[in-house]
C-alpha cells in the first residue's frame, strides 16, 4: 500500500515508518526537518518537507495515498491544539485530494467505556482535571472533527506508551478480533487494567488494521 505518515520524526512515527517499510509498503514521511528523521534511506521511502498544519502544504504528500496515518502529538502537558489542528488540516487535504483512509493516534484518556470502576470514577477524572487536562481536551476535539468527517477513519486509543521492543505478536490478528498476540485490543471501549503498550506494538496494530473493513469508523484500544 501507499502510506503517508505525518509525525514521522516522533517516536511512534519512527516505529510506524520502519515497520511499514519492513512490511513492503511505500511510505511518504511528512516532516518539518528531514534531518530529524531517524529512519535510514530506503528505496520505498519518500521524505516530504511540509507543514502539517497547512492543508495546501501537505496535499501533495496525501494525494494518491491508500492510507494516511497521523502520529502527531503534543510534546508536553501544557495548553495545546496540535492534535486537533493537525487532524483538521489532514482532513481538509484528504477531502481536496480524494484520499479516504485515515488512521489517527489518540489516547485512552479520552474515553471511559470498559474501564474498571477505580479508573473510571477516580483516576481518570483526577487526571483530566489536572496534569492531562490539556492533552485530553486536545485529543477529544481532534476525535470530534474526525468523526464529523466522511472519511474512512479509525482512531487508536493506546494508554501510556513505552519504548519497549515489539512483542512480535501484535500484528498476528486483526485489531477488531479482540486480541493481538501478547497485546489486547478492543473496539469502541477501553481495556480494563490496560496501563501501557509499547510504541512498536501500537505501530504493528495500526499497520495490521490498514485494510480491515471491520475497523472503519471505529475506535481501537490496545494495551499490554
Question: Can you name each region flagged by the protein language model?
Answer:
Residues 3-23:
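N-terminal Rossmann NAD(P)H-binding glycine-rich loop of SDR-like oxidoreductase domains
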Residues 30-35, 51-52:
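N-terminal Rossmann-fold cofactor-binding loop
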Residues 46-65:
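Conserved Rossmann-fold cofactor-binding substructure of NAD(P)-dependent oxidoreductases
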Residues 75-102, 141:
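NAD(P)-cofactor binding segment of oxidoreductase domains
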Residues 82, 87, 138, 156, ...:
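Substrate-positioning beta->alpha
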Residues 143-164:
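Conserved beta-loop-beta element that borders a ligand/cofactor-binding pocket
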Residues 165-168, 178-183, 209-218:
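Glycine/proline-rich active-site loop of Rossmann-fold NAD(P)-dependent oxidoreductases
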Residues 198-224:
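Alpha-helical substrate-binding/gating segment
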